[in-house]
């Protein structure tokens, strides 16, 4: 990795160092081990990895598959829990003394850095699973000494046990810290369930901490560089940006550019971004007592350190001798009490560039007295700010916002309260997943849907509606594709999208290329007419939502297709979805859910460079599918003729529209020879091996099921003569799973 800082702190050797948003250790990067290939991935790096679909296996969960967190949480005395957390915040421990006698700043940073990994493009990251406990996050430079914060919480976790998850505890600690300082938060929701191994996520392609070269395509001109998708941070191992400025160059205006981009990729607008920085830096401090090398991060630390890293050799190694980032900034005169002092100091002085005791670039108030108290009773200091703090004053957009808040702190308090709530809950999905007594009213960013305000349809109604759908003139492919388009927008990463809300009929989803708007214009009016006719004639206050009818229509089509293939099946259907309005739908926020590709529909946007088979597995990951479920769905959707635009790629059957295992049987037929098409990019032609006559066409999203050894093993099961019925059953089960992915109310 190349050097990321033109002005890094003095160092005992010449290895790269840099600093991160508020904290980040002045340490050497761990060196990747150079070795001969040891795994299949090492030998064949281009082979699609389906093992990602089987992460977070229940076998690794020590609580067992029957454990229900919501049930356990209901036993929690939340008020007693809150008191204990706040008492902990205000009780300094000798092994890691608290700044100013309070861990508020440390816990705010821990919660912020847990939630701040969230990124909008793929919904990965966030505080929702307790990922900060595991590598690489537990050893990121930006998370230095947060291992101590989590250890400080252990007595709380030990006491309350299964009634509070680590994920909830890590997130709530920051909320409690704010309240301990006198701030009125907007609310807090519990409901985050722990994972038991690292989240499967590409954080970047750089192979050393603090690198930027790969995510910016080799250019690091801070004025012109473009951060690649889906990354949410400017630098490997940082949450957002380098607080010394881009590439360590202390330029507040250039830093503002990076701040705007990275916070925007976390779904924050300019006002929310400014509020988070101002509010987050109102309490606590950074740590750069000296220019020394701290020890290795937790994952690289000696076994006797028991998962604690960054051991500091300076002085006592803690308290006033702590080295975390090399930056030594205390933002206010009251670092344990909520106030408007951050803005009062930011605008009350002119600022001049200086170096911290750790050698990092920061700003010091010009011609100022030493009014900042020392955290451990030492001499007072002059006011200091990070480069990124000064950005809040000099940037032409952030500046007017923060200057307004200087005179109207009540506006800042409200903006921060709502932005913090959004930060802590952005990856939790709809309010129906929230637990506890402090849940705030639904917000637009939560993609709200109306509550059910009518009687739900019963079995006889369901049968009548299925009959009406099948007699409407709409085809099996039309009904299947519409239901799939509605439900498959779901992302299991941040629990967004899905069929509930019927947003398929609203912008932006109605216009997405993958959803074939011209086809929706044919299908949706017919379904809306069936809905209106039913609701007008139903008795007992019963109604059917369009969201429910779209799913029910698709299920009716699957049942018909199975029956046409000789199998009588019933596709499970659970009513209870409601229809959102356009006013309840943030068009810009939903835009990031638009699929680049959907291998289940054999769709890819023109010019897509990522291999289609890789994008297919990624889509399956979002839909929380296993490899067998993905395989069953592909085989079924191909025979149901549900491809985008009516494409025949992968439709390996002479009876399209009939649910059968023909896709698998014909894929494995050794009488077919496959070659790349000479006419169409990313298409393969299958010809009769003996005669050379054309038989089929396919994409990589089809042929991967014959080329990948793991997927081929599953295909062979479904192609067997004695497993035709099993395939139908497995397809239906996987179909229902996708249709219900966002039905958190079903439990």
Curated annotation (Swiss-Prot):
One of its GO terms (biological process) is hydrogen peroxide catabolic process. The active site is at residue 113. The record marks 109 as: Transition state stabilizer. There is a cross-link at residues 240-266 (Tryptophyl-tyrosyl-methioninium (Tyr-Met) (with W-112)). The keyword Metal-binding applies. One of its GO terms (cellular component) is cytosol. GO terms for molecular function: catalase activity; heme binding; metal ion binding. Residues 1-22 have a biased composition (Basic and acidic residues). Heme b binds at residue 281. It catalyses: H2O2 + AH2 = A + 2 H2O; 2 H2O2 = O2 + 2 H2O. CDD domains: catalase_peroxidase_2. Residues 1-39 are annotated as: Disordered. There is a cross-link at residues 112-240 (Tryptophyl-tyrosyl-methioninium (Trp-Tyr) (with M-266)). Its EC number is 1.11.1.21. Binds 1 heme b (iron(II)-protoporphyrin IX) group per dimer. It is an enzyme of class 1 (oxidoreductase). Its cofactor is heme b. Formation of the three residue Trp-Tyr-Met cross-link is important for the catalase, but not the peroxidase activity of the enzyme. It comes from the Bacteria. PANTHER family: CATALASE-PEROXIDASE, HYDROPEROXIDASE I, BIFUNCTIONAL CATALASE-PEROXIDASE. Bifunctional enzyme with both catalase and broad-spectrum peroxidase activity. Belongs to the peroxidase family. Peroxidase/catalase subfamily. HAMAP family: Catal_peroxid (MF_01961). This is Catalase-peroxidase 1. The gene is katG1.
